[in-house]
């Protein structure tokens, strides 16, 4: 019987899974779309949904709860300043998981997980800013 088997272990320890979800949630918040394996994407969805719900609350306790799950303060800031207000009228269903074929090396099923009303310019924004800063430094 599979009683009390509510999540995928993904062949990792509890601490490794906790770090994995913190890193993946931060990447998804920063880029608003990431590509990963299908089981990881399916497990990440409820974690992100709960964080968006915390961001919609917007109080100090919710911010501290989100900060305890995420690794960097910039992710918490974007979560509460950008994503929370964006989804204030939506009652759940903030992210979607799209199947994306199979990985070449090991045929693992891949998926794209993204926010529903995502900002298409967010993906790669840090790289564009870094390249622009390097070009300005070379010109000066």
Swiss-Prot record:
Q: Which is an annotated Pfam family here?
A: Ribosomal_L17
Ordered alphabetically, the record's keywords are: Ribonucleoprotein, Ribosomal protein
Which protein is depicted?
Answer: Large ribosomal subunit protein bL17
Q: Which molecular function GO terms apply here?
A: structural constituent of ribosome
Recorded hits in NCBIfam families, A to Z, give: L17
Tell me its family.
Answer: Belongs to the bacterial ribosomal protein bL17 family.
Q: List the Gene3D superfamilies hit by this protein, alphabetically.
A: Ribosomal protein L17 (3.90.1030.10)
Q: Which organism is it from?
A: Roseobacter denitrificans (strain ATCC 33942 / OCh 114)
What HAMAP family does UniProt report for this protein, alphabetically? Ribosomal_bL17 (MF_01368)
User: Is Membrane set as a keyword in this record?
Assistant: no
Q: Which SUPFAM superfamilies match?
A: Prokaryotic ribosomal protein L17
Q: Which PANTHER family match?
A: LARGE RIBOSOMAL SUBUNIT PROTEIN BL17M (PTHR14413:SF16), RIBOSOMAL PROTEIN L17 (PTHR14413)
Gene Ontology cellular-component terms for this entry are: cytosolic large ribosomal subunit
Record-level GO BP terms: translation
Q: Summarize the subunit comment.
A: Part of the 50S ribosomal subunit. Contacts protein L32.
Superkingdom field = Bacteria
């Amino acid at each position: 019987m599979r009683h009390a088997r509510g999540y995928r272990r993904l062949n990792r320890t509890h601490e490794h899974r906790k770090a994995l979800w913190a890193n993946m949630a931060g990447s998804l918040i920063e880029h608003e779309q990431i590509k990963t394996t299908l089981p990881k994407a399916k497990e990440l969805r409820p974690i992100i949904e709960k964080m968006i719900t915390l961001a919609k609350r917007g109080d100090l306790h919710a911010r501290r709860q989100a900060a305890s799950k995420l690794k960097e303060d910039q992710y918490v800031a974007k979560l509460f300043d950008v994503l929370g207000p964006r989804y204030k009228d939506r009652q759940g269903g903030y992210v979607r998981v799209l199947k994306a074929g199979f990985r070449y090396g090991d045929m693992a099923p891949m998926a794209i997980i993204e926010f529903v009303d995502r900002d298409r310019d967010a993906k790669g924004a840090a790289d564009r800013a870094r390249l622009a800063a390097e070009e300005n430094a070379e010109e000066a």
